[in-house]
Amino acid sequence: MTTLTSPHDLLAAIPFLIGYHPIDSLVLVSIKEDCVGMAMRIDYPIDQGEVAFDLCASHISADEAEGALIVAYQPHGRSDGYEVLAQTTAALSRAGIAIYESILIADGFYRSVLCHDITCCPVGGRPIPPLDSTQIAAESVVAGHPMPFASFADLGASVRSNLLAHEEQWLERVQKSCVDPLDSDLNNLQRDGATAVIDLANDFIAHGISTDQDLIAHVLGRLSEIQVRDFALGSHDLDSADGYRRMWMHLLRSAPPGFVAPVACLAAAIAYEYGDGALARAALDRAFTDAPTYSLALLLQRVFSAGWPPQSFAQMRSELHPKVCAAIFG
């Protein structure tokens, strides 16, 4: 999904860009060289002071955007959507960012405030078309992208632990592969862990899933070692990314308490890198619940909050990976 040519396209694209169907929200999409860049969503503004809107504009500016698309999902019972759009437009203009589209959504109808043709955008708006009837949805599914979650709650449910994660016997299996950082054979354990990550990833890439529970438990345990985790962070490329995303999400749901943070960070990082910011934050929340001071989670939190471009994060990861490989394999 690189270009959006109409309000209809924009409405269809937003759930794919943020991972779920937003409500009571303000969504901004950055545009660079006529292509979609970053999408960000915030709760529908209650405080309409300049500072809050300028902060949103600063994130779009940090993405080196030339222009932006704005959509306000006005909550039921509110009537200030046009004012929210005007405030957002003013903040973006102060940041030197052009406004390519500005849409108000209220009570199941949408209207572009930039369109003054009432035959195109009547005052009462037009009904929002079903997502699954749009070309954007069809193209996204053909490209291998999953349909967006119905709500933020459904997205959160996708990263919750499953029943296996709470079984005592499963915890014992994972613990057997946990790495003691003072182990005299640490380097061999690191090599074993890195190799296990690749073996499991190949299973997910080839079959979409792995039924090798021993290998899954082994990888979850080995990820407790920082070098193994960092090796895993850099192991995917463009061709293998979908398999790795499926793997980290599967392992995140299966990770027992005390082993969640490493794989949650891996799931968050790859989601962020491929533009799924909402899923990235949901996974990161699980990391903090498991280990509030986990260093990689703190780093990712700073990256996400700063609105660091995903491509910059990917570059950092690719530059780090050869160094990690050299440390593990020599």
Where are these regions (language model features)?
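Charged, compositionally biased boundary regions
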Residues: 1-17, 21-24, 37-330
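Short beta-strand scaffold segments in enzyme catalytic cores
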Residues: 26-30
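Short acidic-glycine loop/turn motifs at beta-strand connectors
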Residues: 31-35
